[in-house]
Amino acid sequence: MSFANMFNKLSGQPESYEKKSLYRFGRTLGAGTYGIVREADCSSGKVAVKIILKRNVRGNERMVYDELDLLQKLNHPHIVHFVDWFESKDKFYIVTQLATGGELFDRICEYGKFTEKDASQTIRQVLDAVNYLHQRNIVHRDLKPENLLYLTRDLDSQLVLADFGIAKMLDNPAEVLTSMAGSFGYAAPEVMLKQGHGKAVDIWSLGVITYTLLCGYSPFRSENLTDLIEECRSGRVVFHERYWKDVSKDAKDFILSLLQVDPAQRPTSEEALKHPWLKGESASDRDLLPEIRAYIARSRLKRGIEIIKLANRIEALKMQEEDEEDIPSAVDVQASEASDKSGLSPFPALSTENSNTHPASTGNGESGGTKKRSLSKIARGAIFREVVLAKVREMKENEEREKVEREARERAHS
């Protein structure tokens, strides 16, 4: 037995903890309800390491083991690859393939151009991954743009599906799941209504993603859960003429088929893959976001991304109280504002898999309390600054939009 193994055993560390020495941890890539994701170097190159605090999943450890079990069974070009896992006394470490190309919507904002044909090819990649999961009776339950990542910065990079934290493997194809799961704006009506759900929830989420890809905004825009439920239950999906006049009929038909209120009326993943729109024959090559629409779409997407980044930053500040070794300083977190994302969902807002919140610091004595209060001030200051900056940006964007619209009207009348 090596000295390191002996020390780990004496300090109460699990046997697998010795694997941690194989990784050199770097920047923080994301933060969420249960932990953070950090970049790390190992002998085979760069990887992503999801670090989950055990105290945050106490009583729900099964959720972590289910994720590990799932990841080890998956092998698909459009699903992030599992590498390894290990644990310490107080954390789980899940090592996966590192996606450095950024989120799907980051790419749209960056290039400012996205054709219907691009959207068709993108959705086909995602649906291929979903179909692979559904054939194995696995429901992802948290499909959203933030969990769709490009592997590299190359223009022809593969898109991969990430974050299987609340995915479930069904005992049989007809099994009904009853726990709340998903993210606000993407969860299916049957999830929000607690009516029981299955594979069809992924199809609904994909419908929301497809709609958003084609116009830059969501088909359901309510800001609270009650109104969102009513909006989704109505079954009314509007294709506003101003933004949808150049989008093919096949694209709209595809979206409507996925956004059926009755889950039994939605196509299966296999059926959806056969839809004419995914063949790309009817999809247009014309840029979907020209002039005013491009500006509006980009500004909306950027605001959404900024909200996610703010949430990540705040969560990382909270996590600072938990562990100094694995969690970087607030300065490090802010410095990674423009960094690549990984598969840790920042907003599993509807999930009831684990009702625990981040516990307060357990530091003893006056100094511990002082540190806790100091971090709270940092968090409050960060929130205030970001809200003010977001408001200023929004005012400027509104002014610019009004200017562009005014000039467009003047050109139309000239």
Swiss-Prot record:
Similarity field: Belongs to the protein kinase superfamily. CAMK Ser/Thr protein kinase family. CaMK subfamily.
Region Disordered, residue ranges: 320-375, 394-414
PANTHER family according to UniProt: SERINE/THREONINE-PROTEIN KINASE
Domain Protein kinase residues, every copy: 23-278
Annotated stretches, region: Calmodulin-binding: 293-315
Protein name: Calcium/calmodulin-dependent protein kinase cmkA
Effect annotated for changing K50M: Loss of kinase activity
